[in-house]
Amino acid sequence: MRTARLVINPAFAVGPVRRRTFGSFVEHLGRCVYTGIYEPGHANADDDGFRTDVLDLTRELGVSTVRYPGGNFVSGYRWEDGVGPVEKRPHRLDLAWHSSDPNTFGTDEFMRWAVKAGIEPMMAVNLGTRGVQEALDLLEYCNVPGVSHLAEQRRANGVDEPYRVRMWCLGNEMDGPWQIGHKTPAEYARVAAETARAMRMIDPGLELVVCGSSSRAMPTFGEWERQVLTETWEHVDMVSAHAYYWEQDAGLQEFLVSAEDMDRFIDQVSATADAVGAAIKSDKVIGISFDEWNVWYQDRTPSRPPTGDDWPVAPRLLEDNYSVADAVVVGNLLISLLRHTDRVWSASQAQLVNVIAPIMAEPDGPTWKQTIFHPFALTSAHAKGDVLRVVIDGPTIASQEFGEVQAVDAVATWADDEGTVFLVNRHENETVQVEIDVPAGCRLVEAVTLTSDDPRWQASAEDDTTVAPRANDTAVLDGTRLTADLPAISWTMLRLAR
């Protein structure tokens, strides 16, 4: 068995663990909203029509923020359709996903759900088919406490106090040709800058996210960020990044090192933002909102929207069923986000329920946990204090795209007298033993590993417990030397205290 050596020291702090790293995403797409978080008439629905079983799992997952209402959906959305008396709301076509929306769930319903879920709302405005005025109207409806027309409309709809939403996304994936209202970098930069400037006239304390690239593979990546940030620099706080990964023709081993791409993506966006700041002699730091990320098998049938005259409400779309290998990759992506906590200020796993999601909810039926639920929930629960830089020296994997990369990847966090190490063994065949130098006086509190002899195993409504994190009995702490065996294709959490 080969060995990887790691050093953990509370002095090697990268930055604070940000609770916003553990965000999620609710879009009017497939069954995420309707028969997902919202299903009036379900046995577990509360008086607002919210599924309490989904709410319970959302809290167990440890979600901190939720981005709403999209996604591609937002670029054709008229927010006014989703407020006011439900019986008067229009039924609209959703061009993004070739579906239709009855608008029985809208802004006020989402805000009520957010309170019950204990999450911070992150709103997106439509800069595809709409612009500055419509964004200002939504902001006024949500945040203004006075006697303005839209504040009064909110009160008439039963909400006296403003929602005071802090984080706002200025559109969605405007670099993508698939986006309704797709724009060039110059076109988008101009409308984003004007929208941001005007929104701050209403509420100077907003945290605004400008659209970055939809993936590192986009042909405009880099140049898009440069042009957009040059125009919007003084008006925004963060730039978005989106990335999805799935096993492709290169095979399982290449898929298992997907986090190498996320690392490079974050580093390159950071470098581009810093270069823009240097060019204009600004000391301001632009953060990254990695507000769409996950494993998503985009080449599979569930990802294909309806066609022709079929415009269903809440069709089954993007309902990927995740394997153990997928869960290991998700755990590794969380490691990447954490170790870049100095630049990643917010993140949203896409999405929360039913649609490429950790939570599944059957119509008129039960909920169940996908494999990817576990690394997210445990990382959210136990990543506290500061993120520590981890030095790794161990066996490597020959990646087709990234060259030689470490088989074991890891990050650690430390808060007061307790620390946690999150690790993945990305080798598809070999167990690797880790030897970790830890601070003196520690004791081992918990060691759990998620793995399976069958890395293709998937959970279902009938069985979501056969494969879950289990105690790793190989973990031993002897003085300042912590050892543990990491099976091939596994995710592990080691908790320490002193």
Report residues per predicted region.
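Non-catalytic accessory regions flanking glycosidase/transglycosidase catalytic cores in CAZymes
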Residues: 1-224, 229-238, 262-263, 267-301, ...
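Active-site His/acidic residue clusters
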Residues: 242-257
